Regions:
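Periplasmic-binding protein-like
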Residues: 110-117, 180, 184-227, 246-262
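Short loop->beta-strand "edge-of-pocket" segments that line small-molecule binding or catalytic clefts
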Residues: 25-32, 49, 126-140, 154
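Extended ligand-binding regions for polar small-molecule ligands
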Residues: 53-62, 122, 132-133, 140-141, ...
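Ligand-binding clefts/hinges and TM-proximal coupling segments of bilobed small-molecule sensing domains
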Residues: 145-158, 194, 227-262
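Extracytoplasmic small-molecule ligand-binding "clamshell" domains
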Residues: 15-92
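Alpha-to-beta junction loops
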Residues: 27-28, 64-66, 72, 83-91, ...
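Short helix-initiation/N-cap motifs at beta->coil->alpha
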Residues: 53, 68-79, 121, 138, ...
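Acidic, polar ligand-binding/catalytic clefts
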Residues: 57, 61, 66-128, 201-202
Length: 262
C-alpha cells in the first residue's frame, strides 16, 4: 500500500510509489490553471497548458503512462501532495527548507527572482515597499519574504494571482509581487498594460522544483535523471523557448540550466 510504504520508508525499505504509478498507468500532477505561462487554460483547446505542463508531459512520457492534470492554487499544492491525491506538483513550486519538511523536491528546473508590478511611477526601489499595500499569493515564498523583510508593508493575501491583479487594477493595492517571469507574462496580457511596469529590482532569487511525496527515493531519482536528460538532449531549452523565447509575448533570456544547482 502507498500509505504504508510511505510510513515505513524512513525506517526500512524504499517506498514503491514509482511502481504504483507504472502499474496504474497514470501520472497525477497538480498544476496551475490560471498562472501563465507556467499553467493556464488554453482558450482554444480548453486544456491546461504551460511550461510546467510540458515538463509534466515529459515525465509521463518517460514513464510510458497517461498524464492526468489536477488544477491547484498556491495554497493547495502541499495538501494535494501529502494527502496522496496527486503524485507530483509542478506549479511554479519554490524549493524551501520549510516545505522540504513535508515533501521532497527534485533538482531545480527553473529559476527566477521575486519582483513587483505597479502603476508607472509608483515604485522604483525596495526601500519604497514599506508603507505600500502589496498583494501576494497566499502561502507562497513571495508572501513570506515580503512579511519577513518588509515589516512595514501592508501585505494583502489572495488565493491566486488573478485576484491580486484585480485588486491592483481596482486600486485596492498599490503593487503585486510574484516571480518575475510570471509578472512579465501577466503584464503582456493586460489590456491597459501601458499604465503598468515591473521595476528593475528583485528582493530574492528562487529555484523551482518538482514536488514529490516524502520518502520516495526512487521517484526523486527518476525525476532528477529525467530532468538532466531533458537538459542534455535540448528538450529543456525547447520547453523554455516555447514560453519565454524570442517569438513569445514575454521574451526572457535563459540564464539557468538544469544541473546548475543541485
Amino acid at each position: 500500500m502507498v500509505v504504508l510504504a510511505t510510513v515505513l520508508a524512513a525506517g526500512s525499505a524504499q517506498a514503491d510509489r514509482l511502481d504504483d504509478i507504472k502499474k496504474a498507468g497514470v501520472l497525477r500532477v497538480a498544476a496551475f490553471d490560471s498562472n501563465p505561462p507556467f499553467g493556464f487554460i488554453d482558450q482554444k483547446s480548453k486544456q491546461i497548458v504551460g511550461l510546467d505542463v510540458d515538463y509534466a508531459k515529459a515525465l509521463a512520457n518517460k514513464l510510458g503512462v497517461t498524464l492526468e492534470l489536477r488544477s491547484t492554487n498556491p495554497a493547495n499544492r502541499i495538501p494535494l501532495l501529502t494527502s496522496g491525491k496527486v503524485d507530483f506538483v509542478l506549479a511554479n513550486f519554490t524549493i524551501t527548507e520549510e516545505r522540504a519538511k513535508q515533501l521532497d523536491f527534485s533538482i531545480p528546473y527553473f529559476s527566477s527572482g521575486q519582483q513587483f508590478l505597479a502603476k508607472k511611477g509608483t515604485l522604483s526601489s525596495p526601500d519604497q515597499l514599506n508603507g505600500l499595500r502589496i498583494a501576494a499569493d497566499k502561502g507562497t515564498t513571495n508572501e513570506i519574504v515580503l512579511r519577513r523583510d518588509f515589516p512595514k508593508a501592508v501585505v494583502v493575501s489572495f488565493d491566486d494571482t488573478p485576484f491580486a491583479f484585480t485588486a491592483l487594477r481596482n486600486g485596492n493595492v498599490q503593487a503585486v509581487t510574484q516571480d518575475g517571469p510570471k509578472l512579465v507574462s501577466l503584464l503582456a496580457n493586460l489590456p491597459d498594460k501601458e499604465a503598468y511596469e515591473i521595476p528593475p529590482f528583485t528582493v530574492s532569487n528562487d529555484y523551482m522544483g518538482v514536488g514529490i511525496p516524502k520518502g520516495e527515493a526512487r521517484l526523486v531519482a527518476f525525476v532528477n535523471e529525467t530532468l538532466l536528460e531533458l537538459e542534455g538532449n535540448g528538450k529543456a531549452a525547447a520547453i523554455y523557448d516555447a514560453w519565454f523565447g524570442p517569438n513569445t509575448p514575454q521574451p526572457l533570456p535563459r540564464l539557468f540550466k538544469i544541473g546548475d544547482k543541485k
